[in-house]
Amino acid sequence: MFFDDCWNPTYTSGKQPEPKAGTHNSGWVRDPGDLLFTSDNLFPTLEAYVKDILESFKNDKRIILWDLYNEPGNSGYKNKSLPLLKSVFKWARQVNPSQPLSVGVWNKDLSDLNKIQLENSDIITYHNYSDEIQHQKAIDSLKTLKRPMICTEYMARRNNSL
């Protein structure tokens, strides 16, 4: 995974803080986070980063799928994540790795992002923390795309998704 719109907004290069015992994802940070919206020249650096990793491992049999971007639009970013989402798919397609590409859908209300994710993913991946009935509805909806499908995040006891 190259990019992530989840969790902590503050990050720095170098050694990271120690994990906090008993705190879920205490050290997880967004990447590139708000820097994406405040730095005018970040895209060339991100493109070089993505292409370098993909070129290095594009035929590596240990990799079964490239999940390019975790939860685009999270942390209130919404459609501000569209340019990076479109770009990461474009950069990956230019490298043409042997493995399939995907970005998991996770919020049905982010229709513009979901459209790009579903149109460009070779394998449909999705996150679902709902109960069994709602999860089945999501599966039934995604099955209409007639592509392989993987649930890549699941289960929240508070949502009865056991």
What are these regions (language model features)?
Residues M1-I123, H127-Q134, T144-L145, R158-S161:
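Active-site mouth of glycoside hydrolases
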Residues M149-A156:
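Short acidic/histidine-rich active-site segments
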